[in-house]
C-alpha cells in the first residue's frame, strides 16, 4: 500500500488523506538522503546539466504542476546518480510518490517556485566547486524550507476543506 491507500471496512479501500505530520517525516528522510548525496557528488565536483536547471525555471513559470514536479525530481535524481551510491536513489525512490502527491496538492501557488530553483542553483554551484559541507548544508536547508512551505500550504488546504464541508477540527 505504501501509505497511499487505506482500508475502508465494508467499502474496500480509499485513497489515504494527506497528512501533514507524515509529510514532514518523509521530508526528514529525504533531507538526510539528499545531504549525503550532495556531499558525495561534491567530492566528485559534479556539474549538473545547466539545461536541467533552465528547464526547471521554465516549468516554474508555467501552470503545468506535473512538469514542475518532474523537473524537481530530475534535479534530485541527477544528484543521486552523481553520488554513485545506488542505495541513496533506491531509498529516496520509496518516498518520492508521497512527495509527488503533496507537491501536486500545493504547487498551484507561485510564491516559492522561483526560490526553489535559486536554491537548486546554489546547491549545484557548491557541488561543482567541491564544497561538500556547503552543498550538504544548502540541500538540508532546501529540504527544510520545502517541508515548512509545503506543510504550511497543505495545512491551509486541509483546514479550508474541513471548514467548507462543515467538519470540526
Give residue ranges: language-model regions.
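Short linear motifs at protein or domain termini
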Residues: 1-43, 151-169
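C-terminal all-alpha effector/ligand-binding and dimerization domain
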Residues: 52-58, 101-169
